[in-house]
Amino acid sequence: MFAFLSCSKNAVEGIDYSNRSRITISFSHVAGEKDLSLGNTTYVNPSGEEFKVTALKYFISNISFTKTDGSVYVVPQDSCYFIIDHSQSSSLTPIVTTPAGQYTKMSFLIGVDSLRNTKDISQRLGALDPTGSAADMYWTWNSGYIFFKMEGSSPVSPQTDKSFRYHIGLYGGNSSGTINNIKRININFSPENIVKVGEAKNSTIYLKGDILKVFSGKNNISIASNSVVMATPNSASIAENYANMFTHVKTTND
């Protein structure tokens, strides 16, 4: 079983979990009006380029929730790193535990913060284990995590196999500065969709990510011009785009 399926399994010493409930964050993905299907479905990006997607994975971390009184609950760091993998349905519903209350906002990072990027490998467990769950989300040559990965094919790609690969990482660097592609996502809940958790009461937050926004928004990204993007300046353009790919669909309180 993958360690990133439920934060609640990673109790943090010194925190009282007796009056806590679960919040499930349910991720779905679309390409415009179409549900995302990996493999054979053809989509068209805002540049008019046809493409197919074979992989979509990204880290979420540093999750927090804001109550109606304005106070903020930050999920303990050792319990808030997840890999969202569209090909693995079990990864699309990470679970966190929070104190009872009503929450009007949530926030999370797409990526892995600089502290965890620089910790000793022995302290990177679960979703952060570069020899396990994060094996294909880690640059061994750069000692850093891939925050967001989208791969596929397109007839306009200049690559011999017509592939495209977007592997976006970089946290600002340690001894030498780099681009910082860590992005914070802020989600506001409408009054009818406030998260209400309490004793024997859990909630599910439904979020939708539109992959077409990876190609547009602040920056126009053409597969013909940018078929492979990794640790290059164009990575910042893609990160700025996917920072706006998420919308809140609804909240259920059970």
Please tell me what each predicted stretch does:
Residues 9-254:
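A short, solvent-exposed, low-complexity linear motif enriched for acidic/polar residues
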